[in-house]
Regions:
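ATP-binding/phosphotransfer module of carbohydrate and carboxylate kinases, centering on a glycine-rich
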Residues: 1-69, 78-86, 105-113, 127-137, ...
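Short clusters of small/polar residues that mark proteolytic maturation junctions
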Residues: 43-44, 95, 164
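Conserved phosphate/oxyanion-binding catalytic-loop motifs
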Residues: 72
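Conserved NAD(P)H cofactor-binding loop of Rossmann-fold oxidoreductase domains
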Residues: 75
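A charged helix-plus-loop insertion that forms the helical arch/lid used to bind
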Residues: 84-99
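General beta-strand structural signal in soluble alpha/beta enzymes
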Residues: 115-119
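Short alpha-helical segments enriched in small residues
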Residues: 122
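Glycine-rich phosphate-binding loop of actin/hexokinase-like ATP-binding domains
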Residues: 135-194
Length: 306
């Protein structure tokens, strides 16, 4: 208990500052602070090529003396095996120019600081666990639905890794070709969940960006159907206490209620849990940290390496 009290005091002290990098496929967000209520500076910029983008991050962080550690919540796939020669590297990403890019090593060498790294969704999950919608939970999922789909899982109070890290966006869900003849947009699998339900897939299927589709458009029923199919699988496999859904596509207010309703229907009464059947509005929720979940997750990753 004394250690936990010491750790809590240290992590929440305004004198202990950490660097945080939310490394996304379209933008990077850099911040320095100690928690949600103590962000000293923040900067965001477009993701270009690795040398330029990493250079801008380093220039930002090098303005601050006395940082204790740096956390990186990054798009992937990532090599997260500590014993691997390519630990902390982006591997087989479809993001042009970023294949086999060292992230953790580049920042550690340049700054001489400990670096914590994980996927963007695992980082956001950690942030929600520390400060947001998953506080006091041991088992939950964090999903992001945007230009890609990713998921982070907490099981028994720990982020799930394993051989690699979960790729929840690349599971297969039933695809009714008669109702939805769209072939899918995933360059690896075609009509996996990511290929059917990202913002990119919606734009290619319907010929316009998701945010421009009206509330009553059939796109939203179909989107909710695919997402609920995935959630039903996750519920049956991982039995989470809560599911948090973020990302640009989920910012459309009509979508979350549709997903909840379809999830309850798809489970068919088999999972007899009042949390789902009677309180779905508290079971499938939006991130409490909103758009800050990623960068605050990176901050939590920095704190975790001390």
């Amino acid at each position: 208990m004394k250690f936990l009290e010491y750790f809590s005091t240290l992590m929440n002290s305004p004198q202990v500052l950490f660097g945080a990098i939310e490394a996304g496929g379209t933008k990077f967000v850099c911040a320095v602070g100690s928690g949600p209520d103590d962000i000293r500076a923040q900067e965001r910029f477009d993701t270009t090529l690795p040398a330029e983008t990493i250079g801008r991050c380093l220039a930002f962080l090098q303005r601050f003396d006395g940082l204790a550690a740096v956390g990186i919540a990054a798009f992937g796939p990532l090599d997260l095996q500590p014993a691997s020669a390519t630990y902390g590297c982006i591997t087989s990403t479809p993001k042009t120019g970023w294949q086999n890019t060292s992230l953790a090593g580049a920042f550690s060498r340049a700054l001489g600081l400990p670096v914590g790294i994980d996927t963007d969704v695992n980082g956001a999950a950690l942030g929600e666990w520390r400060w947001g919608a998953a506080q006091n939970l041991d088992n939950f999922l964090y999903l992001t639905i945007g230009t890609g789909i990713g998921g982070g899982a907490f099981v028994n109070g720990r982020v799930v890794h394993g051989l690699l890290h979960p790729e929840m966006g690349h599971i297969r869900v039933p695809h009714d070709w008669a109702a939805d003849p769209f072939a899918g947009s995933c360059p690896f699998h075609g009509d996996c969940l990511e290929g059917l339900a990202t913002g990119v897939a919606m734009e290619k299927r319907w010929g316009q960006k998701a945010e421009t589709l009206p509330v009553g458009h059939p796109a939203w029923e179909l989107e909710a159907h695919y997402l609920a199919l995935a959630l039903a699988n996750y519920v049956c496999v991982l039995s989470p206490q809560r599911i948090i859904m973020g990302g640009g596509v989920m910012s459309q207010p009509q979508l979350l209620p549709l997903v909840r309703r379809k999830l309850v229907s798809l489970l068919g009464g088999y999972v007899q849990a009042a949390e789902i059947l009677e309180h779905a509005d508290r079971y499938v929720v939006a991130p409490a940290l909103g758009s800050r979940a990623g960068v605050l997750g990176a901050l939590a990753l920095a704190q975790s390496v001390l």
